[in-house]
Amino acid sequence: MVSVNLEAKKTVDVMIEKQDELNIAVSQLSNGATIIDCGVNVDGSFKAGELYTKVCLGGLADVGISIPGDLSEKFALPSVKIKTDSPAISTLGSQKAGWSVSVGDFFALGSGPARAICKKPAETYEEIGYEDTEADLAILTLEADVLPGEDVAQYIADECNVDVKDVYLLVAPTSSLVGSIQISGRVVENGTYKMLEAIKFDVTKVKHAAGIAPIAPIDPDGLKAMGKTNDAVLFGGRTYYYVESDENDDIADVAAKLPSSAADGYGKPFFDVFKEAEFDFYKIDKGMFAPAEVVINDLTTGKIYKEGYVNVDLLKKSFGVDN
């Protein structure tokens, strides 16, 4: 079976080779681990955001950036485009922020291929029937405001049972260009996550997927940046899923439940919802983490289902746009 770490390494190699033109910084820790700073002490770039997102997806997706004019006649934003023919593995088996990395004073949400080696969390990999058993290296992306040290790299190496010199850690804060891009790049993953976690649908039946979401404006306030980046998907994300159903599946019901607008807490910017939940993710309805608009093509029946909608008014409210 394909190795998400070995596939992602191809993109990591490009980032290392082109670090200057990408406005990123590559360094090596004293224990040999490689750190790729994509936004902590550097500016990053659009292209760095594309490549970072592709690494998150285990190299199993095409990632691009464009400015579509159809989000709204009066409101166009640079947007991230995702296409994948391995949706379950690329999004849930790699991209999902499923590893809370806590070592000493360092904490970050970990995404990316290394999760598939040590199966974090194990339930996800049981559900999708995947594990990366081929890799002799570990690649993890970290959403953090500071760069990790030797102790963090050693922890990752130990968890993945690889030599620390074969650990690659990519870092971008939420309040950076690359950070904003990679969160919008989770537009497809938000849908597969909700299918699995909230709707309990077998995501291995999703054979192909595509999505697009606007890139949230960069905010130096980390909490506000987190709100805006989530809203980019919740209110502006559009996704397309190609599903191979069986006779027991109610795809119309899956489609109806999938958009963010189907969640109980829908209707406010995410920062407001998060604040009301006392900044505790676990108090927020899981159904909130979903794209705004969903189209499902049932490959078995030929039927197509469209649910949800782009909410430009809430997107503008979140981003602070007055007109």
From Swiss-Prot:
Subcellular location: Cytoplasm
Function text: Catalyzes the reversible interconversion of 5-formyl-H(4)MPT to methenyl-H(4)MPT(+).
Gene3D superfamilies documented for this protein: Methenyltetrahydromethanopterin Cyclohydrolase, Chain A, domain 1, Methenyltetrahydromethanopterin Cyclohydrolase, Chain A, domain 2
Major site of localization recorded for this protein: cytoplasm
GO molecular function: methenyltetrahydromethanopterin cyclohydrolase activity
The name this protein goes by in its record: Methenyltetrahydromethanopterin cyclohydrolase
Cellular component per GO, a single term: cytoplasm
InterPro entries: METHMP_CycHdrlase
Pfam entry (one): MCH
Keyword Ubl conjugation tagged: no
Pathway: One-carbon metabolism; methanogenesis from CO(2); 5,10-methenyl-5,6,7,8-tetrahydromethanopterin from CO(2): step 3/3
Record's keyword terms, sorted: Cytoplasm, Hydrolase, Methanogenesis, One-carbon metabolism
